[in-house]
Amino acid sequence: MCYPVHVENRVVSLVIDATNAELLARFWAAALGWQIVDRGGYGVSIGIDDGPFEIDFRSVPDGPKSVKNRLHLDIKPVSRDQVAELDRLLALGARQVDVGQGSRSWYVLADPEGNEFCLCRP
């Protein structure tokens, strides 16, 4: 598939509100194999050194989330199988919420603050 060369904007970060930005940043840095790249007055950012994209965790006083996400990440293991990666993510503090249906199964997990994400097959 061919994609156009011209783009209107470039996505540089995904911002996630958190009651504990440091906790979520550490979880996601470990889950993705990234590192903390900035700790500012507004929160904590993770990414890859000089990478084009970051995830920013911003502290908000709203308390724990109470509804399903309208946006979630799908992640795919690179260096291990799906079950081994599931075990690793659970050990980091994720919890299993559901299992995907059909022939392309995936696991629905939640991070330490309850934000859902999917673990796909490699």
Q: Which residues are covered by each model-predicted region?
A:
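Glyoxalase I/VOC metalloenzyme domain signal
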Residues: 1-38, 48-98, 110-122
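Short acidic/glycine-enriched loop/turn segments that link adjacent beta-strands
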Residues: 40-42, 101-105
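Short, charged amphipathic alpha-helical segments flanked by flexible coils
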Residues: 45
